A protein has these predicted regions:
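A conserved short beta-strand within the histidine kinase catalytic ATPase domain
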Residues: 22-29
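Short beta-strand-loop-beta element adjacent to the nucleotide/active-site pocket used for signaling
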Residues: 29-37
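Acidic ATP/Mg2+-coordinating residue in the GHKL
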Residues: 41
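Short conserved segment of the HATPase_c
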Residues: 46-58
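Activation segment
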Residues: 60-69
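Conserved glycine-/histidine-rich ATP-lid loop and adjacent helix of the Bergerat-fold HATPase_c
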Residues: 76-86
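A short beta-strand-to-loop motif within the catalytic HATPase_c
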Residues: 90-94
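Glycine-rich GHKL/ HATPase_c ATP-binding element in histidine kinases
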Residues: 96-98
Length: 190
């Protein structure tokens, strides 16, 4: 089930990795008016017909998931955007990759919460495959802004296949979100 924006983002990153992307970029922006995100990849891309079918919950190519009869990730996201009054842009070109940009009204009653962003970053780094993940974050209201790369995280903590490395990676990712909160607290004290 998709309860948060991070759930939708994880589906999109998984799609990118499974489409053979070597480079995936995810940007999450909160500016007070909108909760926006963009996922860009250099995977196999889709032609116009495939792009339309990707929006259909009753379509799956049968290749990625041989036993699955439906593909719900993108259709669920589109439904959530429609309900909340959000908008999106989905572009793809065969052999070049895909760009999925979307935004929800920040104060919309039907806007899903962002969710656990550091947990999402960690999960997105753990997919099998040789890919670079660029993680970009801006939250104007909290003064948080950072950019991270999967390769840098792996270089710092090692492969993400043991508990120690996962704990270190998660602590580091959470610290990036807390930096803005610390700055805000210091300003209040001054």
């Amino acid at each position: 089930m998709h309860f948060t924006v991070c759930d939708f983002l994880l589906d999109l990153v998984q799609n990118s990795v499974e489409a053979g992307a070597k480079a995936v970029a995810v940007e999450v922006i909160e500016d007070g008016s909108w909760l926006a995100a963009e996922v860009t990849d250099d995977g196999k891309g889709m032609g116009p017909d495939e792009l339309e079918r990707a929006k259909d919950p009753f379509y799956t190519d049968g290749v990625k998931h041989a036993r699955r009869k439906v593909g719900l990730g993108i259709p669920f996201l589109l439904q959530a955007l429609e309900q909340a009054g959000g908008d999106y842009e989905l572009r793809s070109e065969r052999g070049k990759g895909t760009v999925f940009r979307f935004r929800f009204p920040a104060e919309g009653v039907d806007t899903p919460p962002l969710g656990d962003l550091p947990g999402f970053w960690l999960s997105a780094c753990c997919f099998d495959g040789d890919y670079e993940l660029l993680m970009k974050r801006r939250d104007a209201s909290r003064g948080v802004a950072y950019e991270l790369r999967r390769s840098e995280l792996l270089e710092a903590v090692g492969e993400l296949n043991d508990a120690g490395a996962l704990v270190l990676a998660e602590a580091f990712l959470r610290s990036q979100e807390e930096l803005g909160d610390e700055d805000e607290e210091n300003e209040r004290r001054a």
